[in-house]
Regions:
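Ferredoxin-reductase
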Residues: 1-88
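Structural signal for conserved beta-strand scaffold positions within catalytic alpha/beta enzyme cores
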Residues: 6, 58, 163-165, 217, ...
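A generic structural signal for residues embedded in beta-strands
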Residues: 42, 92-93, 235
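Short, surface-exposed secondary-structure boundary micro-motifs
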Residues: 45, 95-96, 238
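Local cysteine-cluster metal-coordination motifs and their immediate loop/turn environment
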Residues: 121, 198, 220-250, 278-283
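Short, Lys/Arg- and Gly-enriched loop/turn segments at beta-strand edges
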Residues: 48-57, 97-105, 245
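Short Fe-S-cluster ligation motifs
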Residues: 243-247, 251-289
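FNR/FR-type flavoprotein reductase catalytic core
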Residues: 76-224
Length: 289
């Protein structure tokens, strides 16, 4: 069992009725062994239920905890946010999984770009690059001010932090591809790391292409076992089929088929809606009677 040490709500999206939560969870072995870019899979039931992959957003090996950040986009994440609080135990927590981010000393800057919930998995990559002395320029963005989080954490680990919102409600009105282009134009950038919604990463790749800067994207697909057996997380990368859970989650952005990935991620939307549905047959009729 893994005890929840801290629970915080980071943001709430009124338009979509979705929240972002931060959980600090006791997990000594994972905290000792994890590296930037790796993820865990959790379940809220011992034997049944959906398995949710989440990149580790932070960790402390000495204190034995990891931090996970998730958005309440479906039935399982909603149940997790409502039913699990500080002092409770997460029944199943497996990790660290996936290949870690390749961190090395660069001649130029490392440009790290996070959008929406993608800000959370970007955080340890920013930290790791900062720790070895790379110049880190970080861009974080969201649709509106209320959906931003980790600003202070990112500023602490970055040489420069650029914050943008789609509607201009906080800091600069822009989408993340605009500062991407500006930074690449003004100085030497050795690598770009982009994490966020698939459509955002697709446009970041398109914006980076004219500059010829290597770009790494971290993919968050549907997963079940996390070992490559089920094939649910397969994506097209170059001319090959890759499994996000074992080959990733990070891939060369220029080679990822984002259109195919986005299509596959809609495969279970109908089932997700059914999971949230509450049958009221007979109940409403009884009220009318």
């Amino acid at each position: 069992m893994h005890k929840i040490l801290e629970k915080r709500q980071l943001s709430y999206d009124k338009e979509r009725d979705q929240s972002v939560f931060y959980y600090k969870v006791q997990a000594p072995e994972i905290a000792r062994n994890r590296k930037a870019g790796q993820f865990i899979i959790f379940q809220i039931d011992d034997n049944y239920g959906e398995r949710i992959p989440l990149t580790i957003a932070d960790a402390n090996a000495e204190e034995g905890w990891i931090a996970i950040v998730f958005q309440t986009v479906g039935a399982t994440t909603r149940r997790f946010s409502v039913n699990f609080n500080e002092g409770d135990n997460v029944p199943v927590l497996v990790g660290p999984l996936g290949k870690p981010t390749h961190i090395e000393k660069k001649d130029g800057a490392v440009l790290c770009i996070g959008g929406g919930i993608g800000i959370a998995p970007l955080h340890p990559i920013v930290q790791a690059n900062h720790a070895i002395g790379n110049k880190v320029i970080t861009v974080i963005g969201a649709r509106t001010k209320d959906l931003l989080f980790f600003e202070d954490e990112m500023r602490k680990a970055s040489d420069e932090l650029i914050v943008v919102t789609d509607d201009g409600s906080y800091r600069r009105k822009a989408v993340v591809t605009e500062p991407l282009k500006e930074v690449c134009e003004r100085e030497k950038v050795s690598e770009i790391v982009s994490i966020g919604p698939a459509i955002m990463m697709k446009f970041c790749v398109a914006a980076a292409r004219p500059f010829g800067v290597p770009i790494t994207t971290s993919l968050n697909t549907i997963m079940i076992d996390g070992t490559g057996m089920c094939g649910c997380c397969r994506v097209k990368v170059g001319n090959e089929t890759k499994f996000v859970c074992v080959d990733g989650p990070e891939f060369n952005g220029y080679e990822v088929d984002f259109d195919n990935m986005m299509q596959r991620m809609t495969a279970f939307k109908d089932k997700e809606r059914e999971a949230d549905h509450k049958c009221r047959i007979g109940l409403d009729a009884g009220k009318k009677a």
